[in-house]
Amino acid sequence: MKTSLRRLRGVLHKHESKDRRDLRALVQKDELAQASQDVEDMRDCYDSLLNAAAATANSAYEFSESLRELGACLLEKTALNDDEESGRVLIMLGKLQFELQKLVDKYRSHIFQTITIPSESLLNELRIVEEMQRLCDEKRNVYEGMLTRQREKGRSKGGKGETFSPQQLQEAHDDYENETTLFVFRLKSLKQGQTRSLLTQAARHHAAQLCFFKKALSSLEEVDPHVQMVTESQHIDYHFSGLEDDDGDDEIENNENDGSEVHDDGELSFEYRVNDKDQDADSSAGGSSELGNSDITFPQIGGPYTAQENEEGNYRKSHSFRRDVRAVSQSAPLFPENRTTPPSEKLLRMRSTLTRKFNTYALPTPVETTRSPSSTTSPGHKNVGSSNPTKAITKQIWYSSPLETRGPAKVSSRSMVALKEQVLRESNKNTSRLPPPLADGLLFSRLGTLKRRSFSGPLTSKPLPNKPLSTTSHLYSGPIPRNPVSKLPKVSSSPTASPTFVSTPKISELHELPRPPPRSSTKSSRELGYSAPLVSRSQLLSKPLITNSASPLPIPPAITRSFSIPTSNLRASDLDMSKTSLGTKKLGTPSPPLTPMSLIHPPPQALPERADHLMMSKQERRI
């Protein structure tokens, strides 16, 4: 009975000692876990402090460099001031910037002394604590490994495995406890000094800032009386609005609540949102206008209500969507008519625009019976010429493109001006080559000295200057059509006549004159007038020369009747086919130039109403 009680008492003592060891191990594990968390928190704190100190030092360096550049600029600009007092103040302000630069550099060095260096020292201490934590973890792993192997040996039946004596286990346990104690104690000491070290760093940094701003303020106050004196003498209010505003914080809070970013403190405003909306509206309007007119291939005339101030805006909008919208039109942009611009300025602008892009107009081949796209006129030319013949001539003589179909011309009841208009209008209707007309079918073309050239580019609706035409006239040969609607049969000529190029000719078509003699071909390219653009590009670009020398025209082949002059005026019987001096080789050129003849006698001031006086006799042509 006594033996059993002793055994029970011994078992109880063993269990109590085991429970104490387990409780001590749990306490050590909790302390190590808390110590590890404290190490991480301290590392994060010092890392953030070092980052802030580095950012402050970098900003101070940039501020120092900016002050140096500002001071150098002020010292360089002092030579521009004629006032001696102003120059002296600028020199003082420039030197002040250099003094502030030195103070900023000192403050930057104080940042390193007060924050960066102490924080790095504390981080080094923290690294030592982390190393102690690593050793403590190793000791714990060794002790726990020994205990695990000892237990496995007792459970195994064969007794195989490494055996440890109780002394070895006790030594391992003691080493682990010693390392844990040192680690926890060192960590607690470092944690208690963390608050003190942070307070020391902040106080020393405050002293550095106070020293910096005090010295900077004293330097600024030394220069302030001189600046104030100069500004008062020149009536300059250098204390701008908002400089000493006590309600600045309240305004910032109100603006944050309202979501507004605009301050009404007299500062400059860079608010462009309203302008952006207006520009977007204009762009959208311009885009819709461009899309609406994308299928228009010819210029349009602005209405009479178009204002002058809208010209530049419309011109800008016509180009705004050109990169984005692929329109069908390849013509020039639409130019509204400006009623206040003089016609001479319009002519100069149109001349410079057209002559810069185009050179000459190539006539189509005889087989082309339909109108080419480039020879279609603007709708604005339909109603030109009936009310005012002079304006119609000045508007239409610039273009070789065919105009719209007109009614039959009444030669016997029109004046000379109307005849000129009809000739020019009908001569532009067709560009195919026709048989030569009668030799006597010479008539006067338009009066004036304006250079008439043709272009294949877009036709604009701006009128030419309405200047009085000079009295000097030149003879041009061409038919006067009677019925532009009816068609004529193919003309047959004598076997000795030059071959003709006919493709279902109309009465309104322009007849081609025979090529002049070789001696007058070189001079004819420099004459002023043309009944159509019939010369090559190189000849058209040459500088025209005005000459009054006469050059006789050759006698064309005989034709039974004319297609452009009434039958009562025909003189086909007077033609002599044996004197034709042109061959088929010279008529092969696409567009021979026409040589105008100068008048022996001055031209009459007013011509009779009848078209019979427009004819010249055969004897005068042979002079």
Curated annotation (Swiss-Prot):
Residues 328-343, 384-393, 496-506 have a biased composition (Polar residues). InterPro entries: AH/BAR_dom_sf (IPR027267), At2g33490-like (IPR037488). SUPFAM superfamilies: BAR/IMD domain-like. Residues 24-51 form a coiled coil. Residues 590-606 have a biased composition (Pro residues). Residues 364-379, 484-495 have a biased composition (Low complexity). It comes from the Eukaryota. Keywords: Coiled coil. The keyword Coiled coil applies. Residues 148-170, 240-343, 362-393, 454-531, 585-607 are annotated as: Disordered. Residues 243-259 have a biased composition (Acidic residues). Transmembrane segments: none annotated. PANTHER family: HYDROXYPROLINE-RICH GLYCOPROTEIN-LIKE (PTHR34119), OS04G0394700 PROTEIN (PTHR34119:SF1). This is Uncharacterized protein At2g33490. It comes from Arabidopsis thaliana (Mouse-ear cress).
